[in-house]
């Protein structure tokens, strides 16, 4: 085990100097992975009773307004201020672009799928003290397809990027809208 804590860390990548970053859900979307570190969990502090403090969110922003549970009010997509802030609290995948096929502005920035907002968020990683801060970049992709739930991004040897999605109307807070009869993946 490299580190402990967080909630649903579904994306992981390294920048060009070997620093680990991962994406998560509920209690923040971007974390700097430090070996041996302890991070906040969704419920409780875990079993590390002698830890002075946990390492906080790397991002200086959230992709939603209010509490993460407010997402349950929305059915098809992020609305209002949450839409403007980046789409919601659920993120999957995490790709730090190190290729040379895209414009230089994307190099060493992290891309992550926002499953509620039907988009790919982009955060700009900047050095701050002994760590990093993630600043909100412009959303890279916004889908108008209600079935779109991005999962991963990865770049190939030529610098081109491949993305996968989970085409389904349901997601993690929807128990009756999941479309299970098509077998689509």
Question: What do these predicted regions represent?
Answer:
Residues 1-185:
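Beta-propeller domains with acidic blade repeats across secreted/periplasmic ectodomains
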């Amino acid at each position: 085990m490299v580190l402990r804590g967080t909630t649903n860390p579904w994306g992981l990548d390294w920048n060009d100097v070997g620093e680990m970053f991962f994406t998560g859900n509920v209690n923040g979307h971007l974390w700097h992975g430090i070996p041996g570190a302890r991070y906040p969990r969704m419920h409780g502090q875990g079993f590390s009773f002698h830890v002075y403090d946990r390492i906080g969110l790397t991002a200086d922003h959230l992709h939603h307004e209010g509490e993460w549970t407010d997402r349950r009010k929305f059915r098809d997509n992020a609305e209002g201020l949450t839409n403007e802030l980046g789409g919601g609290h659920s993120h999957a995948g995490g790709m730090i672009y190190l290729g040379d096929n895209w414009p230089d502005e994307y190099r060493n920035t992290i891309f992550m799928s926002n499953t509620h907002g039907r988009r790919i968020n982009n955060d700009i990683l900047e050095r701050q003290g002994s760590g990093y801060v993630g600043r909100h970049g412009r959303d890279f992709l916004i889908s108008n397809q209600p079935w779109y739930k991005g999962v991963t991004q990865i770049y190939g040897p030529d610098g081109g990027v491949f993305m996968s999605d989970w085409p389904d109307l349901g997601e993690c807070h929807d128990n009756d809208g999941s479309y299970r009869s098509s077998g689509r993946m």
